[in-house]
Amino acid sequence: MTERALSRLEVPAPAPKPRNAGMTMFTDLGCGLHEQEDRMQIAGDFVDLAKLATSMVSTLPKEIIRKKVELYRKYGVEAFPGGVQMEHALYAHGMDIADYVFEEMKDLGLRVVEVSDNYLDLTLESKCKLIEKGAKEHGLKILAEAGDEVEETPLEALIHDCQSCKEAGAYKVLLEAAELMDKKTGELKMHYLDAIKDAVGLEHIIFELPWVWLENVHWYQSFSSLAVMVKKLGPEVNLGNIEMSMLVYAQMIRNGAGTKLAKDRQV
């Protein structure tokens, strides 16, 4: 067992991998292998999934992608391609290209693939067929994104999206961060968190944190949303889009000993 300082404080150790709850996903925007190794040496125990951003898989050489996948797996972290990669392929070549893409991902050593419909006008039925194809025909774990990055989805429709993805065989449902934010106030829509948790099941969802690429989102929203979600849903909530430099900090929040926690404690 790893020895930590201040052992009398009894800070909880992360659950052993593979985990089904308390999972952390972050986005790799193209860091080099040395930086990747450094990050994982420090934070690998706390991380479960690493998204290879957008179309990285078709942008970098195969040998680099394979090395990144292997290096993450060394620390018990599964890399996966962002959903834009599949969306771009479908847009350029049609639905029949999906089998080729899934097999190419497996050839790169990937075991997890994201299916999304952020930029491609896929029907829910088509998205679910892709999920089923990837999971049942190709033996992959499919992360299915639910929600829209631009348009606000009514709560009932968003829940239906999540449930449909789960029933189609999704490993986890990635809940689009933009759907969780009130576009006027920038605050989290707390009633969405409760309703989706109750209807779909906390263990089936990865709640994405808002990132600065969303309109009117600044670091404050991403930073504070992390603490709010953990306080609201508990330390076992699955979280996505953690900034790479905040992986250790996210674990501190899960442990109940980070900043941005409510001042409602007494000594």
What spans do the regions from the language model cover?
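Histidine/lysine/aspartate-rich catalytic loop segments that bind and position anionic ligands
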Residues: A135, K141-G147, L155-E156, C162-Y171, ...
